Amino acid sequence: MPAPVFRFAPSPNGFLHLGHALSALVNFDMARAAHGRLLLRIEDIDTTRCRPEFEAAILEDLTWLGVRWDGGVRRQSAHGDDYQRVIDQLKAEDLLYPSFETRSDIARLAAQGHAPWPRDPDGTPLAPGRRRPWPLLAASPGPGRASAWRLDMEQAIARTGVLRFSETGAGPGGETGTIMAKPQAWGDVVLSRKHFPASYHVAVVVDDALQGVTHVVRGCDLFWATSIHRLLQALLGLRVPTYHHHRLLLDAAGRKLSKSTRATALRELRAQGVTPDDIRRLIEQA
């Protein structure tokens, strides 16, 4: 029986913090316990925010933390052709359509409505969809207006039917076991933009398949996004990994530790004399 394959996939748009350490260590410990392999992937598809110095810091921090990975490092920025092939396939199957509305356009439309506007699991207003009239933009958008390609969710679900995935961790509400996917909750998600070959959802699904990942271990804030990933796997005929979502570390205000809220970086803790064993204790106590 082939060895299980896990992966840790940070984005080099800032320094790693305790939340990243939790995810890296959970992946490392689970891979070791299963006599499996741990891969390292750098999710740098957003070249406007990702920087080489942050990638170098990630490698340094993981080495200091004692997290060892197998094989080379896959960088999304070097594999645009892999994602473009998938986008082209979905276009050829009439599952994608061009969309010119911006997030602010959609938010403005949602604010004009009298009834509550539907929102995705992250709280973002849903796009009107392929079959609903769009009142804010002219039929022919102005020059230079960037287009996105959205998934026709209704048509995609009609092709795949009901989908499920196996959860060995727990979602935000304690969801575990066999989970029914609910991709419809996300509406017509953007899968490609003018300046990006593919969205996070496409890139992560393609990468996991090409790298032979059998176990996806990540924070429970991505639990509901798994429904989109499960749908793409079905549309593309890809193997479905086992999913394991772990808890998040929160700050004093109850918010998820993140780069945007300036969570203390691992390198700062290291400079203060904190050891890798201390990091494990801090995580256990959080």
Annotate each PLM feature.
Residues M1-P116, V217-D221, A225-L238:
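N-terminal Rossmann-like or analogous alpha/beta NTP/dinucleotide-binding catalytic cores
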Residues S104-L257, A265-R270:
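Active-site cores that bind ATP or allylic diphosphates and position pyrophosphate for catalysis
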